[in-house]
From Swiss-Prot:
Demethylates proteins that have been reversibly carboxymethylated. Demethylates the phosphatase PP2A catalytic subunit. Pfam families: Abhydrolase_6. The active site is at S185, D211, H342. Keywords: Hydrolase, Serine esterase. Residues 388-401 have a biased composition (Gly residues). Residues 1-53, 388-407 are annotated as: Disordered. The keyword Transport does not apply. It comes from Emericella nidulans (strain FGSC A4 / ATCC 38163 / CBS 112.46 / NRRL 194 / M139) (Aspergillus nidulans). This is Protein phosphatase methylesterase 1. One of its GO terms (molecular function) is protein C-terminal methylesterase activity. Belongs to the AB hydrolase superfamily. InterPro entries: AB_hydrolase_1, AB_hydrolase_fold, PPase_methylesterase_euk. It is an enzyme of class 3 (hydrolase). Its EC number is 3.1.1.89.
Amino acid sequence: MSDLQKSFAKSKLAKLPPEPPPIPESVADEDDDSGSSTETVTPSPVKQLFARPGGTRGFFDQELYLQRRVNDLDIVHHVYLTSPTNSGPLFVMHHGAGSSGLSFANCAAEIRKILPNAGILSADARDHGSTSVKRASEDGEADPETARLDLSLDTLNQDLLFVIRETQAKMGWETLPDIVLVGHSLGGAVITDVAKKGELGGKLLAYAVLDVVEGSAMDALQSMETYLSTRPSRFPSLPSGIEWHTRSRTIRNRTSARVSVPSLLYHEDVPKDPSKPWVWRTNLAETKPFWEGWFVGLSRKFLEARGGKLLLLAGTDRLDKELMIGQMQGKYQLQVFPDAGHFIQEDQPARTAQILVDFYKRNDRSALVLPPKVADMQASAAMKKGAGAGVPLGKAEGGTTGSFKRS
């Protein structure tokens, strides 16, 4: 990225609203500089007092559980929803691997502050959050045996389309609202795939991808296993899990972490380690067979899909060659968050929301006032000229259009 682009991005960010102040702590973060090492971060008893779960009220109006049978699987998709009003748009959010729909909770609330008629749909992907996938037995009952993990891009694409259409049916919407797709990390790959295949038709206004680029994503996969081996596999309590996310700077906003992290962990009924009964809902190591398929061809699809395009990045040097060329050609909007971590929408929800709302307004077709057609302008001019001359319109003798005969 050029120095000009960097300075432009910083100037744009300076105009955005400030983030709310973090939750105060009684103990200073004197060891924050060590937060980049996820292996050495351990929760402290004092800080756990400030890492309590924050709840989900106030972020979405309701939760839906959408049942679906796919071959031998019974799937219940869990959806957080605030319906649009007065012809407002619907922002459809898709989280990243290992996360949940609550990753967008604070951002959703900020969007509604700026654009009160907007709707927000944020679903838990299969095998994430409260979305369940179980094998169905011959008698139609759920089989306790664990279903085979399938997080391929095609599967996640179809899941998202089902959630959108089933939500429409459940809520009794005659037609879908205008849609803005928003995806973080893996979610960015999913919404780009949906946009490229055009299955939402003209209802898709635009799509926004948060902090994922094909080139850097493919490079990062090489070190993913090392990262997963360094993070804790279990926690003594839910507050300690929240604190790990903030101390390691995985999520840099404590308010966001208190809302989103509880959906990432669950308490084992019979813990393998009774001193640490809280474990991850999604085993990211088991998703390895799908990693490459998520991101191959992402940049090309992002540039080729129809609709407005927005790319939000946490760093200034993550563009691959295709995206650099596309940026120079003005094919998409780029925003850089130099002070955010990977979870842009959680670290800086107010700024993310402002950019998303501005992006929607820029692509809102209902707000466009098209210039009159040339033919209409010519016809109008001819009518005015004829009226000014005081000559009645009619047909020449012989029934064909021509000069008019005065009586």
